[in-house]
Amino acid sequence: MAEKTKKSFFETPLMRSRIKSRTVSLFPEAGLGYLLGPVLALFCNGVVNIWLVQYWHNVIGMGSWAPWLETVIPLASAVIIIIGNLLVGRLMERKPSLAGKARPLILLGMPIIAVALVLLFIIPVPGAANEETILQGLITGQTSMEGGLLASIFAAVGYNLFYAFAWPMYYTSHSALVNLSTRDGSKRGLLGTAIMAAQLGAAGVSGKIGRAHV
């Protein structure tokens, strides 16, 4: 008697993503899955793009203890980001589960995004034990080498985790949902319009917030 293979979480009926109805409605499919969900994720990405360097420079004072790091991390991470995007593409080419091809990666990407954001914006300030020493360290630039190394690791790991793995895992997978969800051309147009509206809305809000605090 052949042994039963253990099913993964994404093979359970709970994660079944196949749409049994013949039509795709504006709500909840398009409204929640293609408009509200993406606009929140894109807004999060926009905030990171706008505020990350300002956070490094103005909040944790990276310019005082590692001025080269603000330039080196994005440049050195370019290759890792390319590899991460290729890896996500390969994962999407695998045999689909009951949850489909894209949904497992979207669900995995969300907690990884949360972890990456924590690493990006909760970086230990070198040599800082309280508010007074944080301020003194930022003013004088007198920081410990050990603290600077730890902060550098946080910044580098958080940056690569977000841009090379977490964000491609969510965004690349979600971008493929339109073609994977339905074969109806008119319904694809509806879903594509919802995604475009989400992109424009998130870009507009993020841009206004960035300009308001420049």
Regions found by a protein language model. Give the residues of each.
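Membrane-embedded alpha-helical bundles of multi-pass transporters/translocases
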Residues: 2-211
